[in-house]
Amino acid sequence: MNLNYSEEQTMLREQIQKFCESEYDFYKREDIVKSDSDFDPNVWKLFAEQGWLSMPFSEDAGGLGFGAIELSILFEEFGKSLVIEPYLATVVLSGSILDKSSYESKNQIIEQICSGEMHVSFAYAEVNKSYDYSSPNTTLDSGNCLNGTKTLVLNGANAQKLIVSCSQGDELTLVLLDSNTKGVSTNSFSTIDGQSCSEISFENVQLDSLNIIATADEAKRLIDESINLATLCVSAEAVGCMESCYLKTLEYTKGREQFGQPISNFQVLQHRMVDMFIESELAKSLLIKAMLEVNNNSDDMFKHCLLYTSDAADDDTR
């Protein structure tokens, strides 16, 4: 089994690295966090020009047809620079659902996502529903009237369209609607890492059959695949954070002197650096295994990957 990256994948990594180094330093990130929009429209436009917004979409829909490996490369590099642009919300979560669905109007929306003109958010989480997304409390009645509340909607304040999971009778259903539709209200807040989240309420929002993306088993499959892919991307982001933290700490210990010698000579710090390196490499290995399992859509594999990388990243950054 060849686990080496292809020439194209290596070039992609180098392209993203150069962009982040020149266009997205920590001060740039801080300016974005403090801004009202929670992302930089100019940076988002550059993402589109680089082709990154088109990466995971099928070629039939106007995308580049890249897969989980390329997305993982992208998010690893994003993790190194703590990029907070709403790529996960629009391209991964919402984009995956649209791209893999049989929704008739999906290509037009995907085209606008790829060009950077449109943000789409996936509203699936609800208060007191744990991690079971198969039976939402948000309802769509027989007259296609939507009622309910979603929480932790990534980039909800900036999205022009929303994909919402709901129950229509006993069937799980996914609907697509404009965020400014009458009856939709948004309360936005910032997450601990500076990203934008929203609680979105739907009160007697009138839809029709054209708003329905998928129902029943297809809706569940689309949600599962979308969340699994997003879990993989977040895990890759954590791996990138860990690697950057390790390299910066290593550089610091070599340059900082105490008692007439670099502190990297002190055994206790050497042990700490070794521990950081081992954690980082183990996380990378688990990420690679998850990338190889992505087509099997193994929920447990992605959950274990995220759990380990999150814990390891937390340990490494303390």
Predicted region positions:
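Single conserved hydrophobic/aromatic residue that forms the stacking wall/gate
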Residues: 308-318
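Glycine-rich beta->alpha junctions and the first turn(s) of the following alpha-helix
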Residues: 3-12, 52, 79-80, 185-281
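Cytochrome P450 C-terminal beta-domain/meander region
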Residues: 132-147
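A short, Trp-centered hydrophobic/proline-enriched beta-strand micro-motif
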Residues: 116-125
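N-terminal glycine-rich flavin-associated loop
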Residues: 83-104
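Secondary-structure edge/capping motif, primarily at the C-terminal ends of alpha-helices
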Residues: 30-31, 253-260, 290-297
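A short core secondary-structure module
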Residues: 149-184
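Amphipathic, small/basic residue-rich leader segments at the start of a protein or domain
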Residues: 1-88, 108, 112
